[in-house]
Amino acid sequence: MLNYNKNDVAPFPPMGWNSYDYYNTTVNEAQVRQNAEYMAKNLKKYGWEYVVIDIQWSDPDAGKQNKSGVQYIPFSRFCIDEFSRQIPAENRFPSSAGGLGFKPLADYIHSLGLKFGIHIMRGIPRFAAHEHLPIKTHDGTKITADMIANPYSISRWNPDMYGVKDCSYGQDYYDSCFELYAQWGVDFVKVDDICNTNMYPENPYSAEKEIEMIANAIENCGRQMVLSLSPGPAVIEKAHHYKNFANMWRITDDFWDDWKLLKAMFERCEVWQSHTGEGNWPDCDMLPMNVLGYGWGDMNSPENKGWKCKFTQEESRTMVTLWSIFRAPLMIGTDLPQLDDFSLSLLTNEEILAMNKNPLQAYQASSSCNENVVIWINECPDQKSYYECIFNLSDEVQTVKLNLKVGNHDNIRDLWERKDLGNCSEFVLEPHSCKALKISL
């Protein structure tokens, strides 16, 4: 791609929806369309734009062993094309029939003014290697999957793939995959088992060369795509490498509706705070809200409704506030058509979302007088105002007094309440709650 710069595709943290938190491995075309339609109608005007299909979209049997506690069916015969590349399962994505792949669905999502994303596991299908199935090469040389597969590079939690060797024909395989994704109209690719290859604790960044091959494949395919790496925790010593080749990288393992995980995120954000910027966004994972987990239940039971998000309203507000001021990617985890009014209000507060688009880095400035209170600050480019978010991480009510900068502070604005507070500088915070303020100098 002429004059390609991977930062251009994500000048701000990407905002969208991901199917995983609600649908697990089971999402189908009708459900993706319903979520896209909801986003276009209710969220697009606030900046939400990516519709991302998560793991196992090529497996026609995904979810059928949920009752047995099996998330990923061992050695499943998922769908591939003549070059060992995954293609959508037609029983779940009927518009893909006839070799069309995800193009009809991507075209529909684009027609709504949105962007389309998919999840892939790094590597090449194991059964393609076992059966010596062909791959597409740049020079027509007959190469089979086993010749580029690394059987010593596998996922700890998913049985589908072998890693790809760092070699010319390994690059050809990734080039051919992303050539296909470009033909489909893919705008966002989440690559899994690559940010931290946790099968190998002594070498958690063992897929470093595959990250480079995938980044090269995006550059070679002729279409801009956001590159998102999972799972975490990302390896801080490799921050420079993530920033050179990816747009997003997960700084945590899967994040769920558990206060302990949310509280721990403050420390992770502090570690990564100096590595945010144009095209480079440390990723706190999805925003779980409202209803979750339907795809983990019995798919044949009408009683399966998933579960209600366990976060309190205060905790949900704290989550969205931290992600926003830290400038993490914002990916909603739920079934959008079921969003309740409160959850929708979190996702459509333009004053909160503006923090996420602020071009300057935020930083954590913990209170020197109260270890239970964490403060995040982000200066505004006009040098006339700044954001200050105050978080009560304790289980007790806390009274917090602002340590205001020198100047006139007659305009302290509460971003969640959407009202000016005058020169008020003392706040009472309920457990696990926060205040998001914009302070004019």
Per-segment meaning from a language model:
Residues 1-33, 38:
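N-terminal module-boundary/linker segments of secreted carbohydrate-active enzymes
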Residues 14-19, 49-54, 115-120, 187-192, ...:
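Structural recognition of the beta-strand scaffold that forms the well-ordered cores
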Residues 40-203:
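Aromatic-lined carbohydrate-binding/catalytic grooves of carbohydrate-active enzymes
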Residues 160-165, 172, 220, 224-335:
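Glycan-recognition surfaces
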Residues 317, 323-326, 331-333, 369-407:
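Carbohydrate-binding surface patches
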Residues 318-366:
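Catalytic cores of secreted or luminal carbohydrate-active enzymes
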Residues 423-441:
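C-terminal beta-strand-rich structural cap/linker in extracellular carbohydrate-active enzymes
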